[in-house]
């Protein structure tokens, strides 16, 4: 029986030590297989890329990623090199000799993990034979007209072939292979059918059928136990893909999902309860100075304010210092991403702010890529007018400053009328004239191709948010991903997020949700739901998420209208906060980032690997069926200082204020003291062998 050394897994201040039996990684090889290795398609690439550094630090030269070869990606992301591992080198050479093009190198990301990349196009001639092998292995046929499924079969067949070559030359080393999503699942199915001596893990980040059903506006979560799965998959012509996914799940030694809500979904859709929930993390970079992220917020907020000045020229009758910037970002899935409920709540928020005569203005950005043909002319003109006005003012400032300087040298206080001559007044009048506008500021920065049928624009027309002067809520649709080279809003996504006040992501279908997690790590409050993995994670392990800047909308047990009202109240409460309260809240939000660090959450992947070894090689590896660290009944406590919103304070004014309250509540707040208390209060969020609530642990769970 192989036994490793005891390892204390805690590299973060305040997080509890986790005494785990360390795997003998020097005697193991770890492979992670995904279609998104060096090939960004969606969020799985973010998972693998962000986790690579932590995993590479743990496994060293025995960690490899397997993915597809695309020349345009490899040229900029991969540094070719020769495999140092003897078994991997022999496997690559053997496959190349048989006509397969296998590329090896280091992925140029943090951790620099090794990558093995298969050129799918070089092996297309094997497709018919491999289809026959796959049919014999699991009885699933793949249509000729499904190009994606055919590519996945080639990729999986090459993966199984490669793993066979590796195990033939492994010299006693045990192999772990983790497969992400159904695209990589064919390799798992074929490996198990051929009885390769490898320990397998299958991870689903979202079920295939779940995405299709939610996109069709079906009451998904309340109907989970009522769906005829085979019928639903057949009607959508994805039955063969569903069978590939389900076979992968049932062939794996260990099945994992990224969140508890996805675990419940997978139990119904794929008919197997996940063995381990492995939450997604991020690489958290701490600043040396405590307030540095607050300074970055001020810097990038000023750049967003510059854009707003140009976009709303001629209608800039609101105070930018009392303006809040909200945003929603992600794929253009109108219902799944919650853009529908967000727009409706903005209409209600606009009514509340106007009714209470609030002097707070809310500018909302929709960063969702859609089909466009060019920039909006009015938007470009606005930025040009702003820049021209800025240059004019700078010229006048230099002239004004020289006259003031000369007057003070003479010991005189200059007469303002003598400082500004007729030419200056003419220039100022021309500048004012150039800012006149006879149309409303546009609600979109680009010309939309499907303007009349676009869901966001159609909803804006229905609710009447046209950026009128009387509207306290202004809307801007930016149908492109952000870029620092853009002539309109020259900012990267991270810079833009840091400059905003609140991210709003009221998703209906979100297996994890990286966008609110990224906000948390950057110290920006966010809105999420109890149907997202991130929302469930925070709701379960933080006593008062709102106090820490995590607003969780109930979209599972409330009607759509009630959920919309709840979101509206969250937004209205946020608008009522003073500047000091927002600063305090951002400090608390940033402190939650430790919970999302891969150095902390990576332990659940470690447990999954240990579990699969104990099931695949029970005579060599054993996992003690003892309860890992758990926090039953514990939650990250509510802060004891000033409340995050005025609901419990002395004033009930809906207006934001720059004047700080001097009451006892404010005096009780000591940032360093509270930060230290928070660090000591962070606990392990859930049991390593986590089983979804309401599900009993299967007998012999730790046995093969």
From Swiss-Prot:
The gene is Gys2. UDP binds at residues 40, 331, 515. GO terms for cellular component: cell cortex; cortical actin cytoskeleton; cytoplasm; cytoskeleton; cytosol. It is an enzyme of class 2 (transferase). Residues 620-704 are annotated as: Disordered. Residues 647-657 have a biased composition (Low complexity). GO terms for molecular function: alpha-1,4-glucan glucosyltransferase (UDP-glucose donor) activity; D-glucose binding. CDD domains: GT3_GSY2-like. This is Glycogen [starch] synthase, liver. Alpha-D-glucose 6-phosphate binds at residues 291-292, 294, 297, 301, 501, 582, 586. Optimum temperature is 30-40 degrees Celsius. The keyword Cell division does not apply. Specifically expressed in liver (at protein level). It catalyses: [(1->4)-alpha-D-glucosyl](n) + UDP-alpha-D-glucose = [(1->4)-alpha-D-glucosyl](n+1) + UDP + H(+). The keyword Transferase applies. Coiled coil: none annotated. GO terms for biological process: glycogen biosynthetic process; glycogen metabolic process; response to glucose. Optimum pH is 7.5-8.5 (at 25 degrees Celsius) (non-phosphorylated state). Optimum pH is 8.5 (at 25 degrees Celsius) (most phosphorylated state). Keywords: Allosteric enzyme, Glycogen biosynthesis, Glycosyltransferase, Phosphoprotein, Transferase. It comes from Rattus norvegicus (Rat). It comes from the Eukaryota. Primed phosphorylation at Ser-657 (site 5) by CSNK2A1 and CSNK2A2 is required for inhibitory phosphorylation at Ser-641 (site 3a), Ser-645 (site 3b), Ser-649 (site 3c) and Ser-653 (site 4) by GSK3A an GSK3B. Dephosphorylation at Ser-641 and Ser-645 by PP1 activates the enzyme. Phosphorylation at Ser-8 is not required for interaction with GYG1. Interaction with GYG1 does not regulate the phosphorylation at Ser-8 and Ser-641. Allosteric activation by glucose-6-phosphate. Phosphorylation reduces the activity towards UDP-glucose. When in the non-phosphorylated state, glycogen synthase does not require glucose-6-phosphate as an allosteric activator; when phosphorylated it does.
